[in-house]
Amino acid sequence: VGGFLFALGSYKFSQLSHLQIMFSPFLPFMLLYLLRYLEGGRKKDLLLFALFCLAQSLSSWHYLVFCFLAAGLLWLWRAAASRGGEEWRRLAGVLLALGAVLLVALPLALPYLRAHGRLPGFERNLTEIKGFSAHPADYLTALRGNLLYSRVSSLLPHGEIGEERVLFPGLAAFLLALLAVAGWARGRKRAPADPFRRGLPLFFLLLAAVSFLLTMGPEVAGRWNPLYMIPYHLGMLRFIRVPARFYVLFLLALAVLAGYGTAWALSRVGGRGGRFPAYRAWGAVLLALVALENVNLPVPMVEVPHGGGIPQAYRWLEKEEAVIIELPTLGLGEEHRYDRLLDFLPRDPHAYSELEGLRVYFSAYHRKRTVNGYSGYFPYSYNRIFYEMEAFPSLRCVELLQGLGVTHVVWHWDLVPPEREGEYRRRLLSTPGLRLAADLGGQWILEVEEGGVSRPDDLELEALVPEVVRPGEPFNLGLAVRNPTPLPTVVTEEEPQGFRLVITDGEGETVEEERGSFRPPFFLQAGEGAVLPLRCRKAPGKEGYYRLDLHLEEGIFGERRFSFTLGVREMPVSEEPSLLEGRVEYAGTAGVVRIPAPDGLFPLDFRVTAGGDTYLLAARESREEEIARPRGLVHLALRFEKEGPVWEEQRGTLPCDLPPGQSVLLPTLVRPPDTPGRYKLFVGLTDEGFRWFGEVLVLDVEVGDGSG
C-alpha cells in the first residue's frame, strides 16, 4: 500500500512534465538502509545507504536537499535517544557517509556554482517563491483526470498536469496514516520491544509535519515561516523555486504511515489459516481502495519523431560544423521593460516549452551547439536574444548572430503565417549577411556570414551621478557606454564587473567606501548606447559637499576612474513628492524617427530633465524590492499609437537618481510595432502608480518592412 502510494500516486502523475521530480526510486531505499544501519550497525547497510543517497541526489539538486533533510532528521531522532558508545559510533558513520556523498557530488555541482556566481539573479527570489508555495487547500486539490474525484464527483478543486500544487493523495492515505498514529499511541503488544523501532511511526509523523511546513514556503497563514526562511537566508534553499515540491518528503512519510496503518488494521483481522487468509483479502481491498483514489486517465502521450521521421534539416546539420539558432520562435508577449529588467514572456508558455523541448530533443541527433532551449531560469542574454530575434531577418539581428558566433539559422516555414510567406522569402534572400545554404521544403538552412566585432575596451564610458543626494540614504548612479566603432559589440559572458566607490570630505577623510558589481553590456550596434546601473548603499550623513571617486577594477573595460563633486542635502523624494515635474527631449536627428524593421528591439536616445523640487528615484536595491515597493520609482514611459495604443506601455530606467534641475542622456531600447507603417510615439515620465507627469513628447515614427 505504501509503495503504491509513493510510486504511483496522483502527485507523480501531476509531475509528468517534471521528470526530475517524478524520478525518486532511491529515496525510500536510502531511508531503509539508514534505518537498518542505525539498528544493526552493518557496514554493508551503511554503504548501501550512501549509494542510494548519492544516486537520488544526482538525479536533481532538489533531491540532494530532500535526501539530506530526511537523513538529517532521522539522525537527530536517533541521536536524541542514543546513550551507548556503539550508537554514537554508528551516528558518526552516518556523518562520514553523508560527507562522502557531498565530496562525490561536488564536482558535478561546480558548473552550477560557477553559473550562480556568474549570472546575476541566478537564484530564486522570495516573490517568485511565494507564487509557488503551497496552501493548506492544495492538500485537497485533485488532478482533473482523477477517476474518483473528477470524473465521478466534483467535491474537490481540480488542477492540471504540470501544476505544482495538486497535492491530494486520497482520503484512504490520510485514514490509514491516522490508524498508524492510533496504533502507535495504544502501544499494542505486537509492537517491537526496541524503543527506536517502536517510535518510527512518530518519526515519520514528524517528517510529514516538517515537510508540510516547508511546502508552505516563506509564510504559513501569512506569518513568517522560520523553518523555511532560516535555511533560505543561509543560502541552502535559494535554488529551489517551488517549495511545494517538498511534498515529495510529505508523500514518503505519508506512504510509510499508510503502510503502518495497513499493518495495524490487518493485525486486527482474524482468519489467517486457509489458502487465502482473510487478512490478505482485506489487504487487497485496502490496496484497491488506494489505487482507485489514484487512477488518473487518460495519461497524456505525445509521439515524437524518430528514425526516418527526423526532419531533414537535422540530418543535414549532422555533416556540418555549425552553431545554430532555430527560428522563428512562438510569439513573445508584451513585456514593459526592455532595458536592465527583461522578463521572458511567451504568449503561450506551455506551447513555447513544448516547441523548445522538441528542439532540444532534435539536438541529440545533430549534436551541434544551439542558442535554443528552455529552463526554469532564463538568463538576461537568452531573453535579450529572442526578443531581438522577433525582428529577424533584420540587419541588427544578423549582426547579433555574428557576434554570438552563430553560423546557421534553421528557418521553420510552418511557424510563418501563410499571408506573410512572400514577405519573409524576400527578406531572407535579400538581407546582407545571410545566404541560403539548403532548401529542404519545410525548413530552410541559412548560413550566417562571418562578421567582425569590436572589443569591449573600445567602448566609450561616462559615469552618471546625481549632483545632489539625500543624507544617509542609498542612491543610484550609472555608467553610460557607447560604441564609437563601425562594428557591433557583443559580450556573451555575464560575469559581474567590479567597481569601488570612495566618498571623501573636504579634508580628504574617507566618509564612505564600498564595493559592488554591475552587468556588462550585452549587444551594442555601431553608435548605440546603453546604461549600466550601479548603486551606492549609503550617502554621507551630513549635509555639504563631498568628492566621489568611482574606480572600475580589472574587467572587460580595463581600469578606469571617474571623479565628481557630490552634494548632500534634504529634499522631497518621489515616494512622497512635493512638486513632481520633468521634461523629455528626443536626442536623435530632428524629423521622422525611422525604425528599419518591425518588432524586435531598437535603440533610441532621450534627454531627461528633472523639474519641480522633488528627487526622482531611479531604482531600488533589488528587483524583488522593486516589486514589493514600486511606489516612488520614476521611469521613462513610451507608448506607440495608431488608431489606439499598440503594444503595451513600455518603460525605461533612468540612468541615475535625478535631483531637481539635473539633466541626463538616457539611451534605451524600445519594442517597435510588429507591422510596418506610420505611428505616433508618446514619451514622458511616469511614477509607478502609472501616472504620467511633466511635459509629454510626441514623435512621428516610420516602421520599415526590413528591406532597407
Give the role of each language-model region.
Residues M30-L47:
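Membrane-interface transmembrane helices that cradle and orient dolichyl/undecaprenyl
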Residues F49-F52, E86-L110, N125-G131, H135, ...:
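Hydrophobic alpha-helical membrane-interfacial segments at the cytosolic entry of transmembrane helices
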Residues L103, P169-R198, L206-L213:
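Hydrophobic, aromatic-rich transmembrane alpha-helices
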Residues G72, L95-L102, V256, T262-V295:
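Signature aromatic-anchored transmembrane alpha helix within multi-pass, membrane-resident enzymes
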Residues S14-I21, E128, H135, R151-L167, ...:
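Membrane-helix boundary/interfacial segments in multi-pass membrane proteins
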